[in-house]
């Protein structure tokens, strides 16, 4: 008698064949699970300095993070280190969405936001993290932005009207075309990535306003609702406020929002030339 072969009701495959396939599938899944469970250790070398500790000097401290148990962004790794490894690690962070600019720092040689910079998954490379360059450091990855904000305040970054009699009583309208002129300017989040990547700002940060502040100055200069364009230009009539920009363009390259501060500064220079000509003829 012929041997009886079990047949599956699904497409008529012999049960023995399906059994072997099932075993192979289970073995494959087991291998994948084992591979997924294997630690993926990434090293982070992070700048550390605590001024409250007597004799403490700036140093780099290395931490190890299993990328299988960490989110994809550098900020995820920093939070994991602080929560699970070293609670003394200090850094700024807030929105985690690239909106607030709090977590600006220098990662692998470039200024960016830790919340939007993906972790380099090459495990053979050590990711190096520093505070924003050429700034006084408060602690670890926290720079002192006091001068930066004071410069921002100095440009009076708000709408100014010469006739304030209607203030609060009517809307200040502008055309769609005039509103579109502000695109690429108002989106600045004041993270200071651009200013702290600028060599001119490194050496003249006390006098040169820097890319971020100048871009915001330009934003208010060209706002059709503002009445103080000439006064804003007059405040920049010195050798340092604007003219320390040498179009190196580090600012545009590093901006995490994809803005172009270098172009805005060039436009201010053109406005300054026209302003000087008008003053000479007056």
UniProtKB/Swiss-Prot annotation:
Cofactor(s), names only, from the UniProt record: [2Fe-2S] cluster; [3Fe-4S] cluster; [4Fe-4S] cluster
Residues that coordinate or bind [2Fe-2S] cluster: 95, 100, 103, 115
Biological processes, Gene Ontology terms: mitochondrial electron transport, succinate to ubiquinone; proton motive force-driven mitochondrial ATP synthesis; succinate metabolic process; tricarboxylic acid cycle
Intracellular or extracellular location(s): Mitochondrion inner membrane
Keywords per UniProt: 2Fe-2S, 3Fe-4S, 4Fe-4S, Acetylation, Electron transport, Iron, Iron-sulfur, Membrane, Metal-binding, Mitochondrion, Mitochondrion inner membrane, Oxidoreductase, Transit peptide, Transport, Tricarboxylic acid cycle
Cofactor comment: Binds 1 [2Fe-2S] cluster.
The protein's Enzyme Commission number: 1.3.5.1, 1.1.5.-
Activity control summary: Enol-oxaloacetate inhibits the succinate dehydrogenase activity.
Annotated residues for binding of [4Fe-4S] cluster: 188, 191, 194, 255
Region Interaction with SDHAF1: start-end pairs: 148-220
Catalytic activity: a quinone + succinate = fumarate + a quinol; (R)-malate + a quinone = enol-oxaloacetate + a quinol; (S)-malate + a quinone = enol-oxaloacetate + a quinol
Membrane topology: Peripheral membrane protein
Class in the EC hierarchy, top level: oxidoreductase
Main location: mitochondrion
Annotated InterPro entries: 2Fe-2S_ferredoxin-like_sf (IPR036010), 2Fe-2S_ferredoxin-type (IPR001041), 2Fe2S_fd_BS (IPR006058), 4Fe4S_Fe-S-bd (IPR017896), 4Fe4S_Fe_S_CS (IPR017900), Beta-grasp_dom_sf (IPR012675), Helical_ferredxn (IPR009051), SDH/FRD_Iron-Sulfur (IPR050573)
Domain 4Fe-4S ferredoxin-type per the UniProt entry, residue ranges: 178-208
Modification N6-acetyllysine, positions: 53, 57
Family per record: Belongs to the succinate dehydrogenase/fumarate reductase iron-sulfur protein family.
Subunit structure comment from the entry: Component of complex II composed of four subunits: the flavoprotein (FP) SDHA, iron-sulfur protein (IP) SDHB, and a cytochrome b560 composed of SDHC and SDHD. Interacts with SDHAF1; the interaction is required for iron-sulfur cluster incorporation into SDHB.
NCBIfam families, alphabetized: dhsB, PRK05950.1
Role of this protein: Iron-sulfur protein (IP) subunit of the succinate dehydrogenase complex (mitochondrial respiratory chain complex II), responsible for transferring electrons from succinate to ubiquinone (coenzyme Q). SDH also oxidizes malate to the non-canonical enol form of oxaloacetate, enol-oxaloacetate. Enol-oxaloacetate, which is a potent inhibitor of the succinate dehydrogenase activity, is further isomerized into keto-oxaloacetate.
Protein name stated in the entry: Succinate dehydrogenase [ubiquinone] iron-sulfur subunit, mitochondrial
Species of origin: Mus musculus
Source organism phylogeny: Eukaryota, Metazoa, Chordata, Craniata, Vertebrata
